[in-house]
Amino acid sequence: MRKPLLFLPGPMQVPEQVRIAGDRPLFNHRSQQLLELLAKLESGCRPLFGTTGDVMFLASSGTGAMESAVVNLTSPGEEVIVVVGGTFAARWADIAKAYGLSVREVEADWRRGATLAQVEGALKGWPNARVIFHTWSESSTGVLNDMGEIGKLIRSQNKILVADAVSGLAVSPMSMDAWAIDAVVVGSQKGLMVSPGLGVVAIGPRAWQKSEQSKTPRFYFDWKKLKGNVPFTPALSLLLELDGALDFIQTQGMDKIFARRAQVADRIRELVRRSGMEVYALKPGNGITGVIPPKGFDMAALRRRLENDFGIQIAGGLGKVKDLMFRIGHVGHVTDEELDYFIHSFERCLTA
């Protein structure tokens, strides 16, 4: 069986250097060695988040990291605002409702993302809401939301902003502190170039203060337990992979990594447009390209042929745009050879 070439919104190919790092021998996780590894990982992640705050690692998916933010920053019955501009943004609302929160949803345009005016209106309409859950990079659409002005607006009203950056971190430059974001959640399987199963949370001082007031029951995802501690068995192999990934990023240089992500995104979007298709996101990030084909185009057949004939996997649409588009992922490391092969294979599927 041939190895699949992944052009998914995540996971993607794990670079050889990262895979080898994850294959290093395991060791006692109740040891100084692990504490030193966690300190190194935290130091390496801070520049990617653009923060001087704390960074913690969870044995969970990105959704687990999202849930950790909800339970640590809210109390039962509390009113919260969720900005919904895609399937994964809506997940914030689903998690919050599961914990008995009073959820106020702001419906953003799925192609353009949320506007400052929409968020300003929500803050005026629901003045009792103290926490706003937003999505920087929407994995279901490819939209990259502008967080800077929104963050400053929320900060000016002494409220807490939490952002999902699962498909944006290490793909596009992030400035958590400068954008006045109080907590950011991600998963390992996208821009960080690590296998799935590691949640990462960056936490600023205002989020810590809010967590001290939270009365939502929590155990596994209790940030206070996790800070500077290893209360549960960690995803050790994934932490070792992340160590390799951060070394890779530091060796390449963050600016070069971001430029490469943008270059790959540009080439794929050029392919989409010259194939007579449309890029779904009007404000796209560098990690995911949502594609609207011509009316009547068989998207399922394209995906089948790419996989069966060329060994390439791409993704379908999700939620209310499921039947409108498909998605090409390029959130992680893509070599020139892989990109050229993808473009050639995609064009073959359309012409043969």
Where are the regions that the model predicts?
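Conserved beta-loop-alpha segment that forms the PLP phosphate-binding cup at the N-terminus of a helix
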Residues: 52-81, 85, 89-93
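Conserved PLP-binding catalytic core of the aspartate aminotransferase-like
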Residues: 278-309
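A glycine-/small-polar-enriched, mobile loop at the entrance of the PLP active site in fold-type I
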Residues: 2-59, 63
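Conserved active-site segment immediately N-terminal to the catalytic lysine
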Residues: 177-189
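PLP-dependent enzyme catalytic core of the Aspartate aminotransferase-like
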Residues: 1, 320, 324-352
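Active-site C-terminal subdomain of aminotransferase-like
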Residues: 13-14, 189-270
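Conserved PLP-dependent catalytic core of the aminotransferase class-I/II
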Residues: 40-49, 247-280, 305
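Active-site phosphate-binding strand-loop segment of PLP-dependent enzymes
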Residues: 114-170
